[in-house]
């Protein structure tokens, strides 16, 4: 069973809205990042050399680490509770400087090959549809996709709070609700 993540958004009337997302799986808490050695600690992580991962979360992000970017686990420093990352498959370890604070997570991207993405906006109380996002898978093997709304679509939205969700449907018909949230539509005042 997949439980959707929650992410609230704001949409401006009569404006383009775009969001870039990455579907991930097997998320685990990183208990420590040793910036000096660029070593990530995560007990019993189960990762192997060459595995694609992304790092998310954190309060203070060390220099040299980009959140939600694809990295590769490397053999150097790999144990059952620690790993190092490279920006390229089989490449050298990334270098980190500064400090790392807050809770970080490691996850593997979901391969979206053969999947379709669907996302609708509906009334929170009545469930009436007010619009549909245009989804585009930008890198299937990296789990990356975009959702977009055109100004013509958002111009028809009434200001207020709505619900939205994102579903991922596999080629075999299995459907998962990956993301849900509140979409707040705000009025704009500029001339067209």
Can you say where each PLM-predicted feature lies in the sequence?
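Contiguous segments within soluble domain cores/interaction surfaces
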Residues: 1-26, 107-192
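Small/polar beta-strand repeat architecture
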Residues: 27-109
């Amino acid at each position: 069973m997949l439980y959707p993540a929650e992410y609230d958004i704001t949409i401006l009337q009569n404006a383009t809205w775009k969001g870039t997302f990455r579907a991930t799986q097997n998320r685990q808490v990183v208990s420590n990042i040793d910036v000096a050695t660029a070593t990530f600690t995560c007990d019993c992580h189960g990762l192997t050399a060459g595995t694609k991962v992304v790092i998310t979360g954190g309060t203070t992000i060390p220099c040299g680490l980009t959140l939600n970017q694809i990295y590769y686990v490397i053999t150097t420093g790999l144990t059952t509770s620690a790993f190092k990352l490279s920006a390229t498959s089989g490449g050298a370890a990334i270098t980190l400087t500064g400090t790392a604070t807050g809770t970080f997570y490691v996850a593997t991207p979901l391969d979206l090959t053969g999947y379709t993405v669907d996302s609708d906006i509906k009334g929170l109380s009545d469930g009436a549809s007010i619009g549909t996002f245009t989804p585009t898978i930008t890198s299937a093997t990296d789990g990356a996709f975009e959702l977009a709304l055109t100004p013509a679509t958002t111009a028809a939205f009434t200001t207020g709070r709505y619900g939205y969700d994102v579903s991922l449907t596999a080629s075999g018909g299995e459907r998962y609700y990956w993301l849900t949230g509140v979409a707040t539509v705000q009025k704009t005042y500029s001339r067209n």
